[in-house]
Amino acid sequence: MAEVGSKSVLFVCLGNICRSPIAEAVFRKLVTDEKVSDNWRIDSAATSTYEVGNPPDYRGQNCMRKHGIHMQHIARQITKEDFATFDYILCMDESNLRDLNRKSNQVKNCKAKIELLGSYDPQKQLIIEDPYYGNDSDFEVVYQQCLRCCKAFLEKTY
């Protein structure tokens, strides 16, 4: 569920059960730790309808639990309203970016800046690979990438 705030970010991946809910949970923890959570509206969504209504992948939940981060999300697809109401839409790979740019062209009042979350990575790992067909270590890689990128994004935007 999105929170009220003066800045807003929507994290997006293909199904909204692996990468984007991890990024959402990581960013929520960062803004909470920095005591700026009241200033942010944060959510995540999918470009597809494949997983709508499902909770995050259990491997991602296990990974986040290991790092002391609570994950509470139900997958949803991005809407036209999201493009008009979020300041930033941060996605995980080139396919997401193409889909989002195509969808944004169908929205008259798109205000969102659409970018790859990996563009904020100090280690220059531009793409956050989908761990769905991988193992627990792939989810750890996604967590570490999201942590680096979300920290850098928060520093740049706050």
From Swiss-Prot:
The active site is at 13 (nucleophile), 19, 130 (proton donor). GO terms for molecular function: acid phosphatase activity; non-membrane spanning protein tyrosine phosphatase activity; phosphatase activity; protein tyrosine phosphatase activity. Belongs to the low molecular weight phosphotyrosine protein phosphatase family. This is Low molecular weight phosphotyrosine protein phosphatase. InterPro entries: LMW_PTPase, Ptyr_pPase, Ptyr_pPase_sf, Tyr_Pase_low_mol_wt_mml, Tyr_phospatase_low_mol_wt. Its EC number is 3.1.3.48, 3.1.3.2. It catalyses: O-phospho-L-tyrosyl-[protein] + H2O = L-tyrosyl-[protein] + phosphate; a phosphate monoester + H2O = an alcohol + phosphate. It is found in: Cytoplasm. Its main location: cytoplasm. Keywords: Acetylation, Cytoplasm, Hydrolase, Phosphoprotein, Protein phosphatase. Acts on tyrosine phosphorylated proteins, low-MW aryl phosphates and natural and synthetic acyl phosphates with differences in substrate specificity between isoform 1 and isoform 2. Widely expressed with highest levels in brain and liver and lowest levels in muscle. GO terms for cellular component: cytoplasmic side of plasma membrane; cytosol; sarcolemma. PANTHER family: LOW MOLECULAR WEIGHT PHOSPHOTYROSINE PROTEIN PHOSPHATASE, LOW MOLECULAR WEIGHT PROTEIN TYROSINE PHOSPHATASE. Pfam families: LMWPc. Inhibited by sulfhydryl reagents. The modification Phosphotyrosine is found at residues 132-133. Disulfide bonds: none annotated. The modification N-acetylalanine is found at residue 2. Gene3D superfamilies: 3.40.50.2300. Interacts with EPHA2; dephosphorylates EPHA2. Interacts with EPHB1.
